[in-house]
Amino acid sequence: MIRFRPAIAALFLLVSGVALGLTPAARADSQSIRDVISSQIDAFLADDVVAAFDHASPTIQRIFGTPERFGEMVQQGYPMVWRPAEVTFLSTEERGGRLFQNVMVRDADGALHILEYEMIEGASGWKIDGVRLRAPAAGAA
């Protein structure tokens, strides 16, 4: 079971959200966004690629076509998301009308990874529209 650090992350999000000038709506959506990402990671941990695929945006679903192909891509390209040891939510950022959730993941070997989840809101709620691996801060290990 992975450890989520919501209390520390919530304080950080509150402070960073105010500092980054997030709108009240964006700040309110932060918890919903974190819930979607957490649910997808839980699905990967359970090898439930169908549930994980459901959290992907229609664009991502069109690109990969099937839950199985999507799961293979994540397993091979984002192993730290497939089997994280620890997940910590960092800041939520609003840029160009889009919301991005930064997430720090510790992999099974103890290495830290910073991922930026691009989120899109649709009729059925928030979906993950892409994930980008960012370089961690110097000395973060």
Where are these regions (language model features)?
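Short solvent-exposed beta->alpha transition segments
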Residues: Q31-D35, S39, V49-G96
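Positively charged n-region of N-terminal signal peptides that target proteins for export
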Residues: M1-P6
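Short, low-complexity N-terminal intrinsically disordered segments enriched in polar/charged residues
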Residues: L20-A46
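Exposed beta-sheet edge and beta->alpha loop/turn motif
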Residues: S91-A141
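Bacterial N-terminal signal peptides
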Residues: A10-G21
